[in-house]
Amino acid sequence: MKINQVVLIRHGQSEWNTLNKFTGWHDAELDKKGKDEAKFAAILLKKEKFFFDCAHTSLLKRAIHTLQYILDELNQTWLSVKKSWRLNERHYGALEGLNKDEVIEKYGQKQVLLWRRSFDISPPQINIKDKRFPGNDPRYSHLNIHDIPLGESLEKTAKRVIPYWNKIVYPELKNNKKILIVAHGNSLRALIQHLYKIDNKAILDLNIPTAQPIILDFDNEKNPIKWHYLT
């Protein structure tokens, strides 16, 4: 692994991915395929002799467990891991827990695609009395209630992801650390869009597959150059 690279990985397939549900901040488990995907991602990394100094993930177990499977395969289970809500999947608001096909049937393919892929359009929001409100979960008890999302667009997701990159991850990169980030489709989309200046229309077409390592390349000044999938 080169010192000017960062590896991003979306978690393996979850039980709610299989059920075709909007997952968001719901803490879905990896299914068997997702566990196998995580192990295969690690095999790809091992084949290319990747070795990490730092690892980051979200507070959701589908990402945490994916990272654990990868570190186990790489014989790096001892590695210190930083976990942050800022790397969580986007919050899908009132869509969380609903079947995607049923939502399409109700609202139409075009509207659902805008909710899922556009930059600045949020899904319908929940309220703080909704059982899905993350403020009911002790893992978010340290957050100001006004920081807890009720439903996010990609733009809102980016507003929490990018500060984490700037304040936590980028200083590690500047210090030539080899970094692995295991997170979620939309938190990673937000980061890639920010780093590689993808316009708001083009980001509609970016869909990140489960457990497919993404290699971010940086120049010697730690400016992003290009990104590609490891296959």
Swiss-Prot record:
Q: Does the keyword Isomerase apply?
A: yes
HAMAP family xrefs:
PGAM_GpmA (MF_01039)
| Pathway(s) annotated for this protein in UniProt | Carbohydrate degradation; glycolysis; pyruvate from D-glyceraldehyde 3-phosphate: step 3/5
Family note: Belongs to the phosphoglycerate mutase family. BPG-dependent PGAM subfamily.
Site residues (Transition state stabilizer), renumbered to this chain: 184
Q: Please name the top-level EC class of this enzyme.
A: isomerase
Q: What is a biological process (GO) this protein takes part in?
A: glycolytic process
Q: What GO molecular functions are on record for this protein?
A: phosphoglycerate mutase activity
Question: How does it associate, per the subunit comment?
Answer: Homodimer.
Is Isomerase included in the keywords of this UniProt record?
A: yes
What is the documented function of this protein? Catalyzes the interconversion of 2-phosphoglycerate and 3-phosphoglycerate.
Catalyzed chemical reaction(s)? (2R)-2-phosphoglycerate = (2R)-3-phosphoglycerate
Protein name (database record): 2,3-bisphosphoglycerate-dependent phosphoglycerate mutase
Mind listing the UniProt keywords for this protein, alphabetically? Gluconeogenesis, Glycolysis, Isomerase
- What's the source species for this entry? Buchnera aphidicola subsp. Acyrthosiphon pisum (strain APS)
Which EC number(s) are documented for this chain?
5.4.2.11
**UniProt-listed InterPro entries:** His_Pase_superF_clade-1 (IPR013078), His_PPase_superfam (IPR029033), PG/BPGM_mutase_AS (IPR001345), Phosphogly_mut1 (IPR005952)
In this chain, substrate is annotated as bound at 10-17, 23-24, 62, 89-92, 100, 116-117, 185-186
